[in-house]
Swiss-Prot record:
GO terms for biological process: dUMP biosynthetic process; dUTP catabolic process. Transmembrane segments: none annotated. This is Deoxyuridine 5'-triphosphate nucleotidohydrolase. Keywords: Hydrolase, Magnesium, Metal-binding, Nucleotide metabolism. GO terms for molecular function: dUTP diphosphatase activity; magnesium ion binding. InterPro entries: dUTPase, dUTPase-like, dUTPase-like_sf, dUTPase_trimeric. Its EC number is 3.6.1.23. Pathway: Pyrimidine metabolism; dUMP biosynthesis; dUMP from dCTP (dUTP route): step 2/2. HAMAP family: dUTPase_bact.
């Protein structure tokens, strides 16, 4: 399934870095740091990185999810400060990425470096019906760890 997403280039330097799928099977689109100069994240530090881009999904049946790049997280401890970013369909502002250095070494974020992935996902908006009791299920109220040993 393909949808068309409106995008604004807020910083002309990003015109050469429009998000694109790397392969036919790619789910995520890389987002890049729109920085004038390198920013060094010390261990434990967070920094809100601009991307120089804005999107408008318009259709409430979709949202965008911002996720960490696996290599940055595994090799350098760089993840998203909010763990997952959610871009609602009606948001039209600049995409920004909260980076968090959970590693033990300083990490330099360079201008135009790939810093996160964006995945467009379907959304179901639920309506809630208040009830006094649920119809029974095999799980019942079993929570954390109730279905296995780990």
């Amino acid at each position: 399934m393909n949808i068309e997403v409106e995008m604004k280039v807020l910083d002309e330097r990003m015109a050469d870095f429009i998000p694109a799928y790397a392969t036919e099977g790619s789910a995520g689109l890389d987002l890049r740091a729109c920085l004038d100069e390198e920013v060094v994240l010390q261990p434990g530090e967070t920094f809100l990185v601009p991307t120089g881009l804005a999107i408008y999904l318009a259709n409430p049946a979709y949202a965008a999810v911002l996720l960490p790049r696996s290599g940055l997280g595994h090799k350098h401890g760089i993840v998203l400060g909010n763990l997952v970013g959610l871009i609602d369909s009606d948001y039209q502002g600049e995409l920004k990425v909260s980076l968090w250095n959970r590693g033990s070494e300083p990490f330099a974020v360079k201008p135009f470096e790939r810093i996160a992935q964006m995945v467009i996902v379907p959304v179901v908006q639920a309506g809630f019906k208040r009830v006094e009791e649920f119809v029974g299920s095999s799980r019942g109220e079993g929570g954390f760890g109730s279905t296995g040993s780990h």
